[in-house]
Structures are given as C-alpha cells and as structure tokens.
Amino acid sequence: MKTDIEIAQSIELKPIVDVVEKLGISYDDLELYGKYKAKLSFDKIRAVESNPVGKLILVTAINPTPAGEGKSTLTIGLADALNKIGKKTMIAIREPSLGPVMGIKGGAAGGGYAQVLPMEDINLHFTGDMHAITTANNALSALIDNHLHQGNELEIDQRRILWKRVVDLNDRALRHVTVGLGGPLNGIPREDGFDITVASEIMAILCLATDIEDLKRRLANIVIGYRYDRTPVSVGDLQVEGALALILKDAIKPNLVQTIYGTPAFVHGGPFANIAHGCNSVLATTTALHLADYTVTEAGFGADLGAEKFLDIKTPNLPTSPDAVVIVATLRALKMNGGVAKDALTEENVEAVRAGFANLKRHVENIRKFGIPAVVAINEFVSDTEAEIAVLKELCASIDVPVELASVWADGAEGGVALAETVVKTIAENPANYKRLYDNALSVQEKIEKIVTEIYRGSKVNFEKKAQTQIAQIVQNGWDKLPICMAKTQYSFSDNPNALGAPENFEITIRELVPKLGAGFIVALTGDVMTMPGLPKRPAALNMDVESDGTVLGLF
C-alpha cells in the first residue's frame, strides 16, 4: 500500500493554467507560483461577482479521534466524485499549519487518492501566506514595543497588552516569555507570549475580509491592549493598519491548486476550529460559488465547533448558506465515543458502534436546527466490518438521515460517487431554510448559553470572576453585539475532553473572554484549551527527510 506522499509523487500534474481554464480563468487572471500553484487576481474576483451563485456543501464531522476522521479527504473526494457525475465543482479548504504537520498529523492535504496537489508544497511553505500572517502579527508586536520604548504617547499599560507574538510551530516553551530585557537600550521589560500563527487574529481577519479596504478596516479595529485608564487601544490608534495590510497584500488573494483528478481547489487561510473559527477564507468560498455549480468546503473538527462557527460566524458573510451538510463519521470514532479504548478501535465491536451513535445523532440534530439537511458519510477504513457498517446504516435510517459509504481514500472519485449522488438528490428534494442559532442582539451570556444548551446540551454556564469582569468591560465598550467564538476541546461536547459520546446535564465554565474586534467576534475560552500547542512524544517530524534530488519523505 502506497503512502500519501508516494501516491502524490506518482501523479503527473497538469499546469494550473490548464486546470482552471474550464472555470473561465485565463493565464492573465493568475499570479503564478511555478507551474502548479497560483493566486487569483482581484480583477478576476471582482469580474465574477455578477455570476450566479452555485450550491454550497459543508463537510463537518462527529467528535474525532486524535488522528482525525478524514474530513479533508472526504471533502476532496466528494468534489472529485461530483465532477465525475457531471457537476461543475470546486473545492474551498484551509491551508495546513506547519505546527501540526510536524507534530501529530504529518500532513493535511487529504489522503490516499483524495488529495490536493502538490501536497509537499501545500503542507510546507506553499505560497508564503502563513509567513506573511506571522510577519504581520510580529510586526505589530514590534511596533507596540517600539511605541512603549519611544515614550508611550498612547499611555499603553504594558501589564494589559493583549497582543502576542506568533510562530507557525507547536512550541510549548514559548507560551510565556519576557521581552525587553538587557537594559534601557532594549525596550521596556514586560511579560509576553507566543501563540501558533493560526490562532492569530490576523489569520481570522484574512479569512473574513472581502477586499483590501475591508482588510485595513478590520486590522484597524484590532484591540491590542488597554491604557492606564482602562480604555482600549487599537491598531488604528497606532496608525499602522496600512503597514500591516501592505505585508498581507498578496496573502489575501486565494490560492489555486488541483486534486489528483484535476478538480480545481482553493486552499486559503487556516484558522483552527477549537481556538478560532475554523473556516477557510470568505474570499475563496465566495469566488468558488461564483465560478462553479457546486462548491465543497469544510469546517474544522466536529460539528459542535467548526460547523457551528461556519453557520453563525462565516455564513452571514457569504452570498448564500449551505444547501447541505455532510457529516463525516468513522467506525473507529463511533467506537471511541462508545467507550472503546484507543488501542482497541480496530477490533469489531457492534455494540460500541450502537453506543457511539448517540454522538452522531446529536450532530445530525444540531445541523437540522440550522434548517439545513444533513447527509452522513461513512469514511471507510480497512478495519471496518460488514456488521459494523450494517448497524450504522440501520441506526441512520432510524433517524431518517441519508447515509453512504465512501471509499475515496482507496478508490478516489469512484469511491465517492454514491455519496455525491445522494448529496445532489438531498439538495434537490430538501431545500435548506437556513437560520442562525442566536440573534447577535442577545447579551454575551445569553449567546454563550444558547450554544452550550442547544448545541452542546449542557445544563449551565459558569463564568469565572475574570470572565465576569471582562463581560462588564465588553458591555461598557459596546462590543456585546458581536457573535461568540467558543474555544473548547474538540473531543467532547463538554469542556472535558474525556466526556465522550453524548454527555448531558454538564456545566461548562468560561474562564476568559477575548474581544477580537478585527475578526468581529468574541472568543470565549473554556477548559485548558491552549493557543500554542505542544509536540507529542514522537512528533511526525522524526519521520521526515529530503533526499539529495529534493524528493520529500515522511509526509503522510
């Protein structure tokens, strides 16, 4: 059995100019990064805005195992299958973060015969967007520290600076640092810290901005900290939004690549769904909707995180809402949610599938609350048994949700045809009637309680003293009408990563609220969610290498 990287390297890529020709995109519309990668020009993005809007398919998942359940793989395979059955389809997905690639995932460009290519480039430096975001973020940090050093005209309280530096790696040693040491020539000493780049507000802004002017407006709105009198200080107060936008002027343009089967794909932006909103860029998704009849996109982690944020935060910024939501389920994740230990997930256990179905059922119910039809995709693994698949199909039938087995990892486009046909049929026969979970006019507490009680099925929300103080400050500053972005473990509906399945009557504790005015939401932090991950005991980096001819080894 070939590895993902071996499959990717065996494919003869088409020039990206030829791949996108069928979408009406010409050579002059592209800014090429070699033969197989390109950015789409703003002139072309504006030119297609008058085109009809196609159908939107959102791919999400049940609460996952640590290895993930193959959402990206299913997204890519479904799009390939839709093209195979004659539907003009595009993909709009996130760019991988180098931290998890070097850490646990080893790659995040799909898998098997459902990959976006060139996968080595996409998983590593790609077109430099991550570096541009990192640079813009850290340029702001440098400008803040310089302002303090040069007399602090804005009277920024260095004890209340919210803005952190970032790096696109998992590096727990950088979570808490002290800067400005070494005497008066080296700045003002203060506590600081690093987040991973994908947790930066600038990443969220890039993924929500619609053009350069909107980018500058959002950058200016970033709250970097507070003055001695407790009033907020913004990037606009520092007058550096133009400089930051300049660094991002190319990064904001969507990246175009291809799948193994030649399906055009936007890969742009990459916020995590547990600590940010978990969706690719609005620009990429919107442009795909104007170029294709069907656009397949994804939202990070389980539907309790990524899909909720897609529907409550991203969708209001799109020209349409999803016409269907595909929920990816694997038998191994169902068994884990049914109480099976991680080292026994490959063993047949029909009763554990039955027990774990409660998790999938809740995700289906939640998607239906948004007025959107759901389809379950069983992402097939070699350890799956006929008995387990049969019982899962029986359970899905009991709640009247369409279900299809998908083998896109092993069989590519052909392995997703049944799923593609079911999704098209579902869209045709069950028109979506999208509605948001909550009204932004509700109070901060009420919006959080809506998410916790209706999506997670908790019974109560507790606000720690720090969070209560921050809510009062948010209200005082007039920020309380923004949507909520929950920062929560991806493994459970609750804030306890060990409470698997479908827990009920639990309490969730909000420990901190962080206003992200540039992004346009408030982050509510729960549990011990980290904005800078650490590496596992045996990071994927240990298996990576490059040969003398440049051949990449170990990405998977």
UniProtKB/Swiss-Prot annotation:
Kindly give the InterPro entries that the UniProt entry links to this protein: Formate_THF_ligase (IPR000559), Formate_THF_ligase_CS (IPR020628), P-loop_NTPase (IPR027417)
Question: Which family is this sequence assigned to?
Answer: Belongs to the formate--tetrahydrofolate ligase family.
According to its UniProt entry, the protein's GO biological process terms are: tetrahydrofolate interconversion
Name residues in a coiled coil: none
Keyword entries, A-Z:
ATP-binding, Ligase, Nucleotide-binding, One-carbon metabolism
Query: Which organism is the protein's source?
Result: Streptococcus pneumoniae (strain JJA)
Q: Where is the organism placed in the taxonomic lineage, from the top? A: Bacteria, Bacillati, Bacillota, Bacilli, Lactobacillales
Annotated protein name in UniProt: Formate--tetrahydrofolate ligase
**Which amino acids does the record list as binding ATP?**
T65, P66, A67, G68, E69, G70, K71, S72
Quickly give the catalysed reaction: (6S)-5,6,7,8-tetrahydrofolate + formate + ATP = (6R)-10-formyltetrahydrofolate + ADP + phosphate
A GO molecular-function annotation: ATP binding
Q: Name one Pfam family in it.
A: FTHFS
